Amino acid sequence: MIPDVSQALAWLEKHPQALKGIQRGLERETLRVNADGTLATTGHPEALGSALTHKWITTDFAEALLEFITPVDGDIEHMLTFMRDLHRYTARNMGDERMWPLSMPCYIAEGQDIELAQYGTSNTGRFKTLYREGLKNRYGALMQTISGVHYNFSLPMAFWQAKCGDISGADAKEKISAGYFRVIRNYYRFGWVIPYLFGASPAICSSFLQGKPTSLPFEKTECGMYYLPYATSLRLSDLGYTNKSQSNLGITFNDLYEYVAGLKQAIKTPSEEYAKIGIEKDGKRLQINSNVLQIENELYAPIRPKRVTRSGESPSDALLRGGIEYIEVRSLDINPFSPIGVDEQQVRFLDLFMVWCALADAPEMSSSELACTRVNWNRVILEGRKPGLTLGIGCETAQFPLLQVGKDLFRDLKRVAQTLDSINGGDAYQKVCDELVACFDNPDLTFSARILRSMIDTGIGGTGKAFAEAYRNLLREEPLEILREEDFVAEREASERRQQEMETADTEPFAVWLEKHT
């Protein structure tokens, strides 16, 4: 089932320097909660400055949903320490609140009013809040409080030059973009390994079902927790953050121009369902528009091709201008065993897997095959640890044992690990392979199995509160290592100044501005 990458691996072993200079970055979301686990109703902590313009700490959907962002980094340890500093400073500056350590929220009552993230009075700030108003009216606020970790990854120019020859200009844009689309297609075909190993949301609180019927065969504990005994990541299931109306958009990952055209079409395609919501009611705007996507970011995807945007530029226009610059992996649940929601083992595994995805052949993929890859993902998400579970290839009928496919994949990853260790020194990547391959013979070692044991004992709420309390105490006491207190104070002041400048510069009424920008 795994493509034959022996030739590509032999090529890599002859060109190890092609992997010198991998760049990566992390984003981690987390809900601010009170000591009893309920959602904080306070505004964004003052010490964190402006959520609109702060370089490292912002908010996602809700005012209580923090998002931490590391700068691009070539050093894994430095990146994780930077992320830990962001958590340390925040933990010391959020009063008695703490950070929820799980992807799935708990203690949010049905119909509870969840305050949308607020970004001030500039047109850009108001637009961001309006977009969130649209998300709330389309999908419900509860779904938007699910948190995850995003891992951003780019291969060095040396890799592309070793693989594609001496490239520059338009040629480089085309070939590098084609290379990243290969990564994306392989990710859709084999990325289910991420929730298998690191999925950490095998259960949900009963409030999450909001009284709606479900066809999933949930088991229920006395405290009202619903779980599937072999599930890995309900966050990635249809109960979590997915968008049914997007499933027939037909966006594919074979070609830059085709992909962008599909995306641009989706933001212009009217939706009957969303038209029923209306655009305005009693003078209050309800969504940006009633199209399938309000803006490009609404496209739900487990992985995205990205380029840093310039001021006023849409993500797709940035891709058209310069091609794909990096990949954003979006399938990671919060790691409940780490105070910062992600750890070194995961980052090293993702490095290995992304390199493998760049090496393995990836035939073009139609939108129907893309839909078929979802079958494997759903199996792993809902019953990934089930003994004897099998997976298919695309829309074909042949089935292969997950256990064997996983081991075959790790046989290749071990060779990538040897190459990465040879240029970085030590054996850190090979150790990660040895630790994780054991999860196929013993699924009890996976994150989902480990966290489910705790959840069955103490419930999601009890588990979440215990971890949140322990991490709060730990982070508050740890000294900063990379950033200093004065760096945070300076960024707070600079971010507030930037927001103020934006608000002062805006003279156009929001309605007029909105018309021009949508």
From Swiss-Prot:
It comes from Shigella sonnei (strain Ss046). Pathway: Sulfur metabolism; glutathione biosynthesis; glutathione from L-cysteine and L-glutamate: step 1/2. This is Glutamate--cysteine ligase. The lineage of its organism: Bacteria, Pseudomonadati, Pseudomonadota, Gammaproteobacteria, Enterobacterales. It catalyses: L-cysteine + L-glutamate + ATP = gamma-L-glutamyl-L-cysteine + ADP + phosphate + H(+). PANTHER family: GLUTAMATE--CYSTEINE LIGASE. Pfam families: Glu_cys_ligase. The keyword Transport does not apply. Its EC number is 6.3.2.2. One of its GO terms (biological process) is glutathione biosynthetic process. Keywords: ATP-binding, Glutathione biosynthesis, Ligase, Nucleotide-binding. HAMAP family: Glu_cys_ligase. One of its GO terms (molecular function) is metal ion binding. Belongs to the glutamate--cysteine ligase type 1 family. Type 1 subfamily.
